[in-house]
Amino acid sequence: MRIGLTSLAFDGKSMPSGIDYVEDVPTKRTSSADDMLGFLHGVDAGQFGTSKFENVCRRALEKWSERGYNSFIYGSPTTRQVPVQSKLGMIQSICRLLPQTSHHKHFLIELLDCQALSDYKTVRQVADAVSMIPNNWSVGVVLDLGEAVRSGMTTSDIINMPRIERFHLRGVDAEEPFDVKRMASQVSLLDRWLDYYDPAVVDLTFESRAADSHYREFIDFADRRWNA
C-alpha cells in the first residue's frame, strides 16, 4: 500500500519522509515530490456543467500535466449536490478531449456523498470506459472514507467495491492531539476491504488541516498497521 498526504496536511515545503506521494492543491504547491497531484476544481471555474467549466477544467489538466503532475483527482465540495450522472458525463467529455501524452497519466474520480453501491458502480463504469480511450490516460476511483462513514456505508457495502485505486482517510479534530480512535469507523471500513482485496494495488491518503504532528503520527500508525 502506498501512503500519501494532501499538501494541506503539512508545511508543504518538501516531501516528508515515509510517504510515497503528495496530493497538491492549486493554492499550495509542494516541491521535491515524486508524484504530484492536483484537484480538478477552482474558484474561477464557473457553474458546473457549463462550457466554461469544462474548458477551465481541461486547461487546468493540461497545465498541471505540463508541470509534471502524474495524476489528478476530481472531487469538489462545490459540486456535491450535482447528480452523479451529470458529473460523470462532464468527466467523460473532458477526458475524451485530453491530448495524447508521452507518459502515462492517471485521473481519479472521487466518490463524494456516495450512495453506496449505486454511485460506485456508475463511477466504475465511466472510469473503465474512459480508460479505453487511446491517449495514455487511465481513470480510477477514490473512496473518501470520511464521507462513506457519514453517509452510512457498512462493511458489507465496501466489500462489494472490488476495484478502488485510492482511499482518503479524514483526520478528525484538527485542534486536538492525533487520536486513531476518533477515526475508528473509517479504519474499520478500510480493514474490511483489505480482508478481501490486495493492499499492494491501492493508495491511502491522509487528509488533515492539523499541525505537522498529525501527519507524522499518521505515517507511523499506517506503517505499523498496514505495511508491517
Model-derived regions: residue spans:
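Histidine-acidic metal/acid-base catalytic patches
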Residues: 1-18, 23, 30, 51-70, ...
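N-terminal small/glycine-rich loop or linker at the start of catalytic domains
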Residues: 1-4, 34-46
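Short active-site-proximal "capping" loops at secondary-structure junctions
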Residues: 26-31, 41-46, 211
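Short acidic, glycine/proline-enriched helix-loop-strand junctions
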Residues: 31-37, 103-105
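Short loop/turn segments at strand-loop or loop-helix junctions that form parts
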Residues: 38-45, 74-79, 109-112, 169-171
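Active-site groove signature of glycoside hydrolases
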Residues: 66-83, 103-114
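Catalytic cores of phosphodiester-bond-cleaving enzymes
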Residues: 91-116, 219-220
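Basic- and aromatic-lined ligand-binding clefts that recognize polyanionic substrates
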Residues: 104-134
